[in-house]
């Protein structure tokens, strides 16, 4: 049994797609860009933070192939994606305050997640959230949706490298005071799998989030679960 479980947020414990989609469309519209994206495509924008999400949205606007979006924001980033950092930052200044003010409108926990957190606490397992979502939104959502459920939560902030770099997880482990070999990282994307591996931890991938079971299996990831009960069994076995 693991002594600590570290969770991603978007697509793992919370279905945030509705609010993320609204915020992307608002920011793009306000800055004169293409908007009206649906949740299916927005799911592929996110996973590596706001900057990469906006870069992917702008690349789609410029007819970048949707099936190559996951390469943007990685070391294998294509040369033909959107590259104007000044424009990305301009849109980000609209997106961030709007999302922080509207991050809890449509968002809610996935089935069984609240019960899972209680069962883990009852077993004495420490829990934490490490997300590339802006830290202000992470703290708001943890407080509103999971009061008292987590021992630690951390989102994207200045001065610490975002996932898949291990820095955020390392900070979490420092606070939890649990050896990394006794912790597991849980997420729904290729970024989460890389984060866990880069942090020297086992990884459990969930298939109810922003990436499909088939996509996760193609990486291939270490272990895939399809519901909260399966996840509990993997954490406590």
What role is predicted for each listed range?
Residues 109, 130, 161:
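Residue-level marker of regulatory loop/turn positions in helix-turn-helix DNA-binding domains and
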Residues 6-8, 130, 186:
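Generic enzyme active-site microenvironment
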Residues 87-91, 133, 149:
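Extended, well-ordered alpha-helical scaffold segments
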Residues 2-115, 123, 139:
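N-terminal helical cap/lid subdomain that shapes the substrate entry/recognition surface
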Residues 1-3, 29, 64, 121, ...:
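Asp-based, Mg2+/Mn2+-dependent phosphohydrolase catalytic module
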Residues 103-107, 132, 202:
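Short, flexible loop segments at the rims of nucleotide/cofactor-binding pockets, characterized by
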Residues 12, 131-133:
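Conserved phosphate-coupling serine/threonine residues in phosphotransfer and NTP-handling enzymes
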């Amino acid at each position: 049994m693991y002594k600590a479980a570290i969770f991603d947020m978007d697509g793992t414990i919370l279905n945030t797609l509705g609010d993320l989609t609204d915020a992307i469309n608002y920011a793009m519209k306000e800055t004169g860009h293409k908007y009206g994206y649906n949740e299916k495509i927005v799911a592929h924008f996110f996973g590596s933070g706001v900057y990469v999400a906006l870069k992917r949205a702008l690349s789609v606007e410029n007819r970048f192939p949707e099936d190559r979006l996951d390469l943007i924001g990685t070391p294998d980033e294509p040369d033909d994606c959107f590259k104007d950092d000044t424009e990305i930052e301009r849109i980000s200044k609209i997106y961030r305050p709007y999302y922080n003010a509207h991050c809890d409108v449509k968002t809610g926990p996935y089935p069984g997640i609240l019960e899972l957190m209680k069962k883990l606490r009852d077993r004495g397992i420490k829990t934490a959230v490490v997300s590339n979502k802006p830290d202000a939104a992470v703290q708001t959502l943890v407080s509103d949706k999971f009061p008292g459920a987590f021992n630690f939560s951390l989102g994207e902030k200045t001065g610490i490298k975002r996932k898949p770099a291990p820095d955020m997880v390392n900070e979490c482990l420092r606070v939890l005071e649990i050896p990394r070999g006794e912790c597991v990282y849980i997420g729904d994307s290729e970024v989460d799998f890389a984060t866990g591996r880069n942090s020297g931890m086992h990884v459990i991938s969930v298939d109810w989030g922003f990436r499909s079971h088939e996509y996760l299996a193609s990486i291939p990831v270490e272990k895939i679960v399809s519901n909260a009960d399966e996840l509990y069994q993997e954490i406590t076995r």
